[in-house]
Amino acid sequence: NVVVVDGDMRRPKLAQYLGAVGSVGFSNVLSGGATLDDAIQATRFPRLSVLTSGAVPPNPSELLASQAAKKVLSDLKARFDYVIVDSSPLLAVTDAAIIAASSDGVLVMTRFGSTKREQLAHAIKSLEDVGAPVLGSVFTMTPARGASSYSYNYGYYGEGEAGKPEVSTTSPVSGRRRADRRKQEVSGSE
């Protein structure tokens, strides 16, 4: 069983994406306006529940940093096999780092053609600064290459020269590998 929590209390979207009622959710539970049982909703997908963001509060960071938030997340971990929290953008506000600090792991979502290497490095450093374990990064919005080709990327995060963050990846594959593009530093030098 999996529960997805909309931790983006500034621009919540999960209710819309999953066809759920968004008026009562995480913010309401944290502020004492609803119980967790009242706020968790089933979705059309088997074994997937959602805790929508709820009413947009005036103080999202305070709510997310509260003991109530830690208790709710702990209660969810006891009820579900997996708890996935979708948060606000990491570099825009502190909300994501607050949630990440008490998580078992973080996947950093990066948008192809939009997220700069420096931004990714800064985001990872922000997570490390709060002690959040970075499990990896997911590259979204990658362009389609056509029906006759395929591509994939994989990589790992580590330390490069002089302690600089480094991301190692393979290049998109379309028939053959390009070994000369395997390693690229997050700092932008190639």
What are the language-model segments listed below?
Residues 1-190:
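P-loop NTP-binding module
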